[in-house]
């Protein structure tokens, strides 16, 4: 599986539709995840961001999903296999930040900071 496919598979594993940043269709239905696709070569780290997008009066569901993702990555990180090796995902600092949307006060966003270490042949 390519690096891009492995990263997509990871973000798609949370029962939400996952979109690479800037590819969200105009008719996308909340909630969903957007993620930054960054790839590197052997023994290089790269900062990666993702966002959870919900439309709700409450932060309860988005906070629960943020915690689910945090637990999946865990304190020691999450290793995902890909062609030529693995990608080691780790929680960044700060891991999650709450954001709103100026155009719609019901839109809730959690901005996630991740570090991806690429242990791959290329």
Q: Which residues does each predicted region cover?
A:
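Charged, amphipathic alpha-helical segments and their flanking helix caps
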Residues: 1-22, 27, 34-122
